[in-house]
Amino acid sequence: MTGLLEGKRILVTGIITDSSIAFHIAKVAQEAGAELVLTGFDRLKLVKRIADRLPKPAPLLELDVQNEEHLSTLADRITAEIGEGNKIDGVVHSIGFMPQSGMGINPFFDAPYEDVSKGIHISAYSYASLAKAVLPIMNPGGGIVGMDFDPTRAMPAYNWMTVAKSALESVNRFVAREAGKVGVRSNLVAAGPIRTLAMSAIVGGALGDEAGQQMQLLEEGWDQRAPLGWNMKDPTPVAKTVCALLSDWLPATTGTVIYADGGASTQLL
């Protein structure tokens, strides 16, 4: 993918550890020639240490998508890093959260609305608020890409996060309509299960042994169903799909979901 993103400036959100999908997207984007600006939430010193493992250094900005000041100042803070008069060409939204009450073995009906609403705010509404914050400094022809997970089925242990992903898909269609007015595309990538820190914790029993077993069965079944197979320890195919959407090679694709899951979502068994 050398040169695919040459000369492009990309904002990447959501790096937490070097197992984060966002980290691998950032790595592949840099290898493809992109200049990056990164955002982190909360433990910025830790995120900075992780970001230093990327092929090239990149500025790191603080971003809590529930903080209106962070959002309202984001464009100016990005401009301060890339230079006055310059704009960005792409945005990666790799942000998701659902309180423990809304996932795992906890009964679906028992999740408090306050927890569910927080999860939907961070996982879905923030896609629109991030787009609104950065569109004024995006070049026409650019793209916004968000991370999805197939929400068309009731996934074990995923519970209200599945609902949040359904909301994200709807939000994406409206973001595409608004962003299209300034020539910017908006799409989601629905990834197969990846062994991120959060997924590893669930499989390890962080949300209960039953939830861990369910997620492990989901992972194993994914590889069996996928016509191309699926390696949950290799996020590179997902990262490449995101970078393809950030490139100039899909100029008429917007408002949709691209699957990077080995084809498992198309198969019953």
Swiss-Prot record:
Checking Gene3D superfamilies in the record gives: NAD(P)-binding Rossmann-like Domain (3.40.50.720)
Give one Pfam family: adh_short_C2
Residues holding NAD(+): S20, I21, D64, V65, I95, G96, K165, I194
Annotated site, May act as an intermediate that passes the hydride ion from NADH to the substrate, chain positions:
F149
- Give, as in the UniProt entry, the pathway in which the protein acts: Lipid metabolism; mycolic acid biosynthesis
Per UniProt, what does mutating V238F do?
Answer: Thermosensitive mutant that shows high resistance to INH and ETH. Displays total loss of catalytic activity at 42 degrees Celsius
Q: Which family does it belong to?
A: Belongs to the short-chain dehydrogenases/reductases (SDR) family. FabI subfamily.
What is the designated name of this protein? Enoyl-[acyl-carrier-protein] reductase [NADH]
Protein's organism: Mycolicibacterium smegmatis (strain ATCC 700084 / mc(2)155)
Which lineage do the record's taxonomy fields give for this organism? Bacteria, Bacillati, Actinomycetota, Actinomycetes, Mycobacteriales
What's the encoding gene here? inhA
